[in-house]
Amino acid sequence: MKRLLILAYDFPPYVSVGGLRPYAWYKYLKEFGVYPIVVTRQWGNKYGSELDYIAPSESTETIVEETECGTIIRTPYKPNLANRLMLKYGSNKFALLRKAITAFYELLQYPFFVGPKSGLYRGAKKYLKSNKIDAIIATGEPFVLFKYASALSRKFNVPWIADYRDPWTENKNRAELPFVRFWERHFMKNAAAMTTVSDFFKMKIGENISLPKTYIIPNGYNPDSVKAVEQTEQCSDVFRIAMTGSINEWHPYKSVISVFAEFVKETNPKIELNFFGINRSEEIQQFAIDNKLEHFIHTYPRMDNASLLENLCRHNVMLLFNDYSYMGTKIYDYLAIRRKIILCYGNDSEAMQLKDRYYPYSLPGKTALSTHLQEDCLNETKAGIVVQDKNHLLSVLTELYNEFSQNGFIECHSINTDKYSRKEGARQLAEMVGTKLS
């Protein structure tokens, strides 16, 4: 059986979309003839918020877990001074000092093995001194893991794979961009192969580096988690719409919430708009208060994927914002639980202005790549409605609410969703490690 060392900073129990991809590899690779060894950091859910990302680990020793799926090496984590100040005094104090310290470590972590993430390198290096493996894969971000994989590859003569969940240099500011571009090119020189989630990202990454052998392994949903909640029924007494994950600046969330508020005031329905684990909770809560919608709009903190799916299943409709050339990750869970999706928006003037101002990705004038991946997916799977603009949204809400009032649920007759399983992604990675790197 081939043995694959996986460098993954985000990993359960930390609640992170980025951790779901390597977790699926860990869970399913062995079924396809590859034994996974995950090197990550120790995580806790002490705060249930972003503070868990910088909280110190409970143990100062490396913890090794052997399970039926594989091996997990959890290295200790000690926050730097900036993070300790944040934990002790909160986000409003020492902001400039914390920013300077963070920038210092950001600069030094590439030429030197320093900073709070370097424990993964030391843990992997110790393991490799006494254990043989066939390949290394590092999943970014954080992209400093590419440095660790590159160094380990040279030291132990093992091929390494760079897994890009997102492009490395796309969203950097102008001052930082030349610096990270240099290091990206430097570390990728000895990569045996590259994986990423879409042809669009492959193209964007190729704008900065000479691409090695590249394989597209999309994101997806965890089939075991979905199976555990497949008998969960929709709510039948209140029409519930759910949205999960980050709300980005190019998302027309203000427009959508305003239309929702208009619908509530016009029809006085039994309806809820619920947000799970979002990054704009305070803003949306304040909007609800200002518009006397506290009983209709709610926000909930982050939760583990299994609990999130259980909650989503009790809703009738899933809200999805348009990410254009980028598929995102939340759409896969929506597809998996077979709840109707409403995509906002397909062609709304206000949304287009937000896209022009904030959207970080661009395509060349002539390309065969799609600029509406989520819309393509919904059309292929028949899983939802592409809402064209805010006027269309009002009519869609009316139609869906009428269907709910009549039936007590919303029908969803989606098809061809099985191919979006993360287990399929693990199979593709196993095939790559087993044959194409040999």
Located regions from the model:
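N-terminal subdomain of nucleotide-sugar transferases
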Residues: M1-Y77, A193, T214, F263-E266, ...
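Nucleotide-activated donor-binding/catalytic signature segment of Leloir-type glycosyltransferases, i.e.
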Residues: G277, E282-L309
